[in-house]
Curated annotation (Swiss-Prot):
Domain called Protein kinase: residue spans: 150-408
Comment block on domains: Binding of the PH domain to phosphatidylinositol 3,4,5-trisphosphate (PI(3,4,5)P3) following phosphatidylinositol 3-kinase alpha (PIK3CA) activity results in its targeting to the plasma membrane. PI(3,4,5)P3 is also required for phosphorylation at Thr-308 and subsequent activation. The PH domain mediates interaction with TNK2 and Tyr-176 is also essential for this interaction.
Protein name, per record: RAC-alpha serine/threonine-protein kinase
Family stated for the protein in its record: Belongs to the protein kinase superfamily. AGC Ser/Thr protein kinase family. RAC subfamily.
Enzyme class: transferase
Domain PH: 5-108
Catalytic residues as annotated in Swiss-Prot or TrEMBL: 274 (proton acceptor)
Activity regulation comment: Three specific sites, one in the kinase domain (Thr-308) and the two other ones in the C-terminal regulatory region (Ser-473 and Tyr-474), need to be phosphorylated for its full activation.
Record's subunit section: Interacts with and phosphorylated by PDPK1. Interacts with AGAP2 (isoform 2/PIKE-A); the interaction occurs in the presence of guanine nucleotides. Interacts with AKTIP. Interacts (via PH domain) with MTCP1, TCL1A and TCL1B. Interacts with CDKN1B; the interaction phosphorylates CDKN1B promoting 14-3-3 binding and cell-cycle progression. Interacts with MAP3K5 and TRAF6. Interacts with BAD, PPP2R5B, STK3 and STK4. Interacts (via PH domain) with SIRT1. Interacts with SRPK2 in a phosphorylation-dependent manner.
Protein's job: AKT1 is one of 3 closely related serine/threonine-protein kinases (AKT1, AKT2 and AKT3) called the AKT kinase, and which regulate many processes including metabolism, proliferation, cell survival, growth and angiogenesis. This is mediated through serine and/or threonine phosphorylation of a range of downstream substrates. Over 100 substrate candidates have been reported so far, but for most of them, no isoform specificity has been reported.
Source organism per UniProt: Mus musculus (Mouse)
Keyword ATP-binding on entry: yes
Principal location listed in the UniProt entry: cytoplasm
Amino acid sequence: MNDVAIVKEGWLHKRGEYIKTWRPRYFLLKNDGTFIGYKERPQDVDQRESPLNNFSVAQCQLMKTERPRPNTFIIRCLQWTTVIERTFHVETPEEREEWATAIQTVADGLKRQEEETMDFRSGSPSDNSGAEEMEVSLAKPKHRVTMNEFEYLKLLGKGTFGKVILVKEKATGRYYAMKILKKEVIVAKDEVAHTLTENRVLQNSRHPFLTALKYSFQTHDRLCFVMEYANGGELFFHLSRERVFSEDRARFYGAEIVSALDYLHSEKNVVYRDLKLENLMLDKDGHIKITDFGLCKEGIKDGATMKTFCGTPEYLAPEVLEDNDYGRAVDWWGLGVVMYEMMCGRLPFYNQDHEKLFELILMEEIRFPRTLGPEAKSLLSGLLKKDPTQRLGGGSEDAKEIMQHRFFANIVWQDVYEKKLSPPFKPQVTSETDTRYFDEEFTAQMITITPPDQDDSMECVDSERRPHFPQFSYSASGTA
């Protein structure tokens, strides 16, 4: 492999993801897709070791806009099934053009490299046999899945790029979450985006505590991901009913979450980013399922004040608020917050006023109820360290650090993965179609949410109309 070289460097203004202020950053773009930003221009190798921002432009889509400031450009990527955006601006159109060209050139180069590797792997340089084989090995669907095969029950979430709907598969009576993304968001009008590599990542992901992808398909203007929807209820629901969990019960859930995050970090090189109580569900046996129904929240209006905020602020790690680089350690902060909630019955930092809340997250020392045991205190203190490099799990060992903590001393991690531990609570459901933990308002009566556009029922769009998205239909093998 060639040495990694800097393709372009210079000052950019980067817009904060959560606190929407513009911050000057000195960015380096490298030919391996790394795009890293610093507060000051790095003078030596040591300074280069610790960037504030660390992104990749691989498989990104680039957009230029004159709002909220002139000469703005946005880098958009699909991570997992969630659309992520980074916003920058420069002083002149020429400068923006230079950055855009450099970023596009690097992204295209990486795409070519990946295609060559794919061809090499499938042993055929010219055709799509690699992709075909992949579909076959995943039990190629006997028919194309369409939107008409589901009943639409409830809107679970809505965002800038699409929506998530609770659906029931007519043929089986099983419940799924269908995530529907607008195609135009992901594919630039005049270029083919490199979107579906992520789809492949999802398809190949198998972990007992992660929501599995059951189907993915497309209509003429949407991409649809159909994912498991565990029916043992949200952990949030069970915790609010019981107010607090015992340390043993929290340990069980914590261990399953650690197992799933370890898999994402080490096997998939993905940071989950969105760990919070609402994203944790129980399956019918009482095991954890981490959902992937996340959507970017509605974007703020152009020209809104700097104080505008987007997202769930209570769970944000200090480094995210400061818009510094956040790597895997951000997930361990999230684990700290949800485990604190489970064992203490409240959030570690809370204030209705966002400004005050941010200050607490950044400055306030963590406090514990007197009833909490020393191991639990030690674990939570480690996970909720403000500095991600000092945080438990923040080092190179990642999840292994947490697994070795004395709070988890009696846990056999292979047994966790193999679901050999007995869940401390078994939901009172009789089958996968039992809806007792769903909101009564939508299980009592059949609500029909029409698919996003009436004409979405025109599934069988001929393939010429979807040149951007070859090989998008997917069906998981075996039972869900």
